[in-house]
Amino acid sequence: VAFGIDFGTSNSVVALADGDGPPRFASFELLGRSTASFRSLLFFDLDEQRPAEPVVFSAGPAGIEAYLDALGEGRLIQSFKTHLTTASLGRTALGPHALDLDELLALFLGRLREGASAALGAPIERAVLGRPVRFAGSRDDQACARAEARLRRAALAAGLGEVELELEPIAAAYHYEAGLERDELAMIADFGAGTTDFCVMRIGPTHRGRRERSDDVLVTGGVGVAGDNLDAALIEHVVAPALGKGSYYREFGKRLPIPPGYYYKLSRWHQLSFLRGSRTRHELERLAQHAESPAALEALMMIIEDNQGFHLHEAVEATKIALSREPRAAFDYVHEDFEVHAQVERADFEAWIADEVAEIAACLDQTLARAGLEPAAIDRVFMTGGTAFVPAVRREFEARFGSGKLSSGDELSSIAAGLAGRARSWDAAAG
């Protein structure tokens, strides 16, 4: 029984490859609907926590439902995969409990494992787990090694007795390869929420199914710029100004700008929970008393205190997706005490994300250069992940390879399917 686990920054997916057919995906219930996505988040109802008792929490779809039922009370933690490279993060206070990142990861992976085991009707005791080429926030190989070690520890603590790690773009290559009838030299581009990863690989019928594939991989590359960075641009330019960014307050006879740090954390999903604390609340209350636009600061406090990160994320994501289809899109965020509405032009959005797109394109060029290849040598470009559909990103690939060489895969399941297929190959070789 071969399992693949795609632990993503925003969403996680578990696949099972049993027999010779295509992988099956664990399915979960969310608000009465079936989904293969297990949202990468944890929710803690602080009223349910008791000293000397295990921490009470929900994860994935159940975490979303518990969060919605709690009407903003409690602690929502999302995008925690982005913290994997952090050397010292401290502990997260959860009522009488205080958990470090390793413990939070183990809670999430354990609940994912339990839910997927029940959904697939088979206990998950060993699996192939995906990892990016370069973890988000990694500045050197030491940071990447720290992140991988942390991921392995958490997987073992979550009940996975045996774990193999595979690079996510290589897993996407295995998924794409499963449908090929002839060999290709492929460029794989995996666009996640926290990282963008590439690999150049020989794939096809003569390569498929072998356990040892290292000779087929010409090069890998990655950069910690991806979907969350594009979300941050929308927060910075559309949402934050309505919440006081760029405005001023008066104190001690001086006119001073509202500190930008609050808005930076607001725009980074993995840092949003850090704003929920008495110190931040007192600082913002003081600023609001002296602000030229106090209502905007009060709205920012409501988003923080009412734990609105999930709802804000949904509104931003909807606008980003719409901008991939249309030249303009509406941004609509509704709180019970205030609303933020805006029309966003695709041209403006592309100007805001120009630096991020340039970083992705530079990593693509560096990956090709390290392989010693010109774009014309690539037979096919397989792109997976939501950012693959952002027109500004897609144009970079069209300019290098031509639109005829580009193909896209299922943004949700490609990685997990490839990981499960790889697990099946390893099991077959071991058997």
Describe the function of each predicted region:
Residues 1, 160-189, 417-424, 428:
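Conserved phosphate-binding catalytic cores of ATP/NTP-utilizing and phosphoryl-transfer enzymes
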Residues 1-23, 176-213:
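Gly/Thr-rich phosphate-binding beta-strand-loop-beta motif of the actin/hexokinase/Hsp70
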Residues 7-11, 194-195, 225-232, 410-421:
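Conserved A3 ("GATE") glycine/threonine-rich loop of ANL adenylate-forming enzymes
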Residues 16-47, 204-236, 347:
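Short glycine-rich, Thr/Ser-proximal phosphate-binding strand/loop in the N-terminal lobe
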Residues 20-139, 144-152, 156, 238-308, ...:
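Phosphate-binding loop and its immediate beta->loop->alpha context
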Residues 25-27, 65, 214-224, 297-301, ...:
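Short beta-alpha connecting loops at secondary-structure transitions
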Residues 28-33, 164-170, 224-225, 407-415:
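Active-site nucleophile and cofactor-binding loops and adjacent substrate-binding regions
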Residues 208, 232-247, 267-431:
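Helical "lid/coupling" subdomains associated with nucleotide-phosphate turnover
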